[in-house]
UniProtKB/Swiss-Prot annotation:
It holds the Pfam family Coq4. Coiled coil: none annotated. Lyase that catalyzes the C1-decarboxylation of 4-hydroxy-3-methoxy-5-(all-trans-polyprenyl)benzoic acid into 2-methoxy-6-(all-trans-polyprenyl)phenol during ubiquinone biosynthesis. Its main location: mitochondrion. Belongs to the COQ4 family. This is Ubiquinone biosynthesis protein COQ4 homolog, mitochondrial. One of its GO terms (biological process) is ubiquinone biosynthetic process. Component of a multi-subunit COQ enzyme complex. It comes from Drosophila sechellia (Fruit fly). Zn(2+) binds at residues 171-172, 175, 187. This protein may be expected to contain an N-terminal transit peptide but none has been predicted. The keyword Translocase does not apply.
Length: 268
């Protein structure tokens, strides 16, 4: 842990053995150690990211948390909150990714989930009990699109930036495997599962403060059914970030849930 803290204190380019002026070209000085090559995602992210000071990070974290609390529909503030408060959790997630073969493949490939990268016409041809077919049905039933996620801008390390990007783009896949809709009750339940599974502070915040805005009837159902179910699944489920979802389209969704330790809530 001490090594990680020391590493975070160094500028990103220096951690990779690069001078700041040479990030885009990946030129390495003769004095610096051999740098780990930047992949396409990392190069693009370093061009577009917004550098902020520790004070600015603290200010943005506090301001975005207040704004998100006052208006949970401010997705820009929720995104900012996730980036300014989630660095420690993301390092832990990175360790989890590197501990599994599937997670290592994700970090090497850095797949993206967009309408331009996923063959949705193919997914529509899959049997209805497959994960891919369930994902398409979820998108249609809830009228959502994978293209709506905000880009990551404030994280220093591009690997952590990819993990935050991955978390955002996989959110609807988590909804799918949990069989939860995108209404407030479903979102709060999913946030609890994500919080316990990833440790991201913004997920805990969304779970706690989102529940405050539930209507009385929703709150009764939440306390009696949804919350116990979400807490149980959040604690029991295997780590979800290292799951290479795009390689699971043809898998039977019931078998996938069983593999991950996930049960579906009986909403009747």
């Amino acid at each position: 842990m001490m090594q990680r803290c020391l590493r975070l204190q160094k500028p990103l380019a220096l951690r990779r053995g690069l001078h700041l002026a040479q990030v885009n070209s990946q030129a390495v000085t003769t004095e610096a150690p051999e740098a780990e090559p930047l992949d396409a995602f990392e190069r693009q992210y370093l061009k577009e990211r917004i550098e902020i000071s520790p004070f600015q990070r603290l200010f943005l974290g506090a301001g975005s948390s207040i704004a998100a609390l006052l208006n949970p529909r401010r997705h820009d503030m929720i995104a900012c909150l996730g980036e300014t408060t989630g660095e420690d959790a993301l390092w832990t997630i990175l360790d989890t990714m590197q501990a599994s073969e599937e997670g290592q493949r994700i970090m090497a490939d850095k797949p993206r989930i967009h309408t331009s990268t996923i063959d949705f016409k193919y997914l529509e041809t899959l049997p209805p009990d497959t994960f891919g077919a369930a994902y398409v049905k979820f998108l249609k039933d809830n009228q959502v699109t994978p293209d709506s996620r905000m880009a990551v801008r404030f994280l220093e390390d591009p690997k952590l930036a990819y993990l935050m990007t991955r978390y955002r783009e996989c959110h609807d896949l988590i909804h799918t495997v949990l069989d939860m809709p995108t209404n407030m009750l479903g979102e709060v339940a999913v946030k609890w599962v994500e919080a316990l599974n990833t440790g991201l502070p913004m997920c805990y915040g969304g779970a706690v403060f989102g529940a405050v805005r539930l209507r009385p009837k929703q709150r009764r159902a939440y306390l009696k059914h949804y919350l116990p179910w979400a807490l149980e699944n959040g604690k029991r489920a295997k780590p979800l970030m290292p799951v290479y979802w795009e390689k699971r389209w043809e898998q039977n969704i019931h078998e996938l849930r069983s593999e991950l330790g996930i049960t579906v809530l009986n909403k009747a």
